[in-house]
């Protein structure tokens, strides 16, 4: 899902897509761990606040609900304000380096898989 967010066809603001191309392995936060409902989101000031609130050890959803409200995330996706709310992003966001079409991205994925199979996994290829 994360990789498809950064495609030309994805209906989210270009700012989000461009920010994803700048990401690295440290660009996500795990939230709601203390509430046993872990979510990985893109690291920004809002997700940092949620993680900080949770670090007290006694946080409840009531303590963070205004920060994580869906309407705030909608503003991120529709208006491109990257610090307005949280937005889901998997660790694979670190591998996003461009914003291709879906067709280009899937073709590249297939080509890369074939290279791995033909190159490194030749002995297991049927």
Q: What is each PLM-predicted segment?
A:
Residues 2-126:
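Conserved active-site-proximal phosphate/metal-binding subdomains
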